[in-house]
Amino acid sequence: MVYVAFNKKTIEDIDVKGRKVLVRCDFNVPLKDGKITDENRLMGALPTIKYIMEKGGKVILCSHLGKPKGEPKQELSLAPVAKRLSELLNKEVLFPADNEVVGENAKKAVENMKDGDVILLQNTRYRKEETKNEETFSKELASLADIFVNDAFGTAHRAHCSTVGVTEFVATSVCGYLIQKELKFLGNAVENPQRPFISILGGAKVSDKINVINNLLEKVDTLIIGGGMSYTFQKAQGYTIGSSLLEEDKIDYAKEMIEKAKEKGVKLLLPVDNVAAEKFAEDAEAIITEDQNIKEGYMGLDIGPKTSKLYSQEVQSAKTVVWNGPMGVFEFEKFAKGTIEVAKAMAESQATTIIGGGDSAAAVNQLGFGDKMTHISTGGGASLEFLEGKELPGIAALNDK
């Protein structure tokens, strides 16, 4: 899979001076009362935007935000992003707010651009064609530009107009710095890791991570499992799990994976104790189980202290760690300890530490460990599909070197 990482043209392989450059960014940021609450994705886009500006290109930015389902929704307008980008770039980012995205305002704004100017188009998902990858909208986007740059790793696993369709109608399609960085870290971790290589998987469902578990068992030295998905594995081992989250139809699969780990000589670590409660609530009374078994009427909501210690020690011995998914219900303080301990062990480790986006990225940033990690992926779904060994359509569509 290294081919994905290194055989695509990048922004440095082309001349952008005086050219109109359409850049697909990932500005799908959380908003509260019209204010951006997490700027991680904006910061990630800046190197590519600045490079094109400095080289005298005309920068036309596009992105989706939320799920407007093909119609304009004021609360999902990219206006707050344009405002914040103007501040971060020290330059006005023009925002021709066309509900049809590529409307008269946008076309006129692009026509009047000077070298080094930046404009941001309206939310691409205001158009219903976007998620269906329909030719009409792809052609409209392409008509604005000479060059297309994909720098949205977070949507690289989606074949939409603004990620894949547009590449058919623009002569040159390359990747930006953010996608390069993502592929460098994730690609090296999966294909050429420094060993011991450990992967930690958490989150609620086994079904979300089936292919990831299967693929990683071919690559890792140790696989650590926590979070809601661990109870299906504990059940498969023959333990009682009370009223914990269980995917009945995945018990056999969990047994197969336990067997596969043995065959491959991979150390598979599962919880040895749990933090449980009678209800799923912030004020629920937490108990710690003595071993793997959870008694009737109780549900597991976090890994227990013995497990946290076991997992943290394992992390300390690693040279490469990839983590995707929290160890428990980290939004409730009583059930956040497992996630905190694992994050702390990674932050203190000398290893290359990679956080696979989504909830784990949120947890790490919330806990203040963000700057202690080697790389925090900007794409939850995309990084998962990458770890499954799948080709990402948004990257496959770019020009080869």
UniProtKB/Swiss-Prot annotation:
Keywords: ATP-binding, Cytoplasm, Glycolysis, Kinase, Nucleotide-binding, Transferase. This is Phosphoglycerate kinase. GO terms for cellular component: cytosol. Belongs to the phosphoglycerate kinase family. Substrate binds at D26, F27, N28, R41, H64, L65, G66, K67, R125, R158. It comes from the Bacteria. PROSITE patterns: PGLYCERATE_KINASE (PS00111). It is found in: Cytoplasm. InterPro entries: Phosphoglycerate_kinase (IPR001576), Phosphoglycerate_kinase_CS (IPR015911), Phosphoglycerate_kinase_N (IPR015824), Phosphoglycerate_kinase_sf (IPR036043).
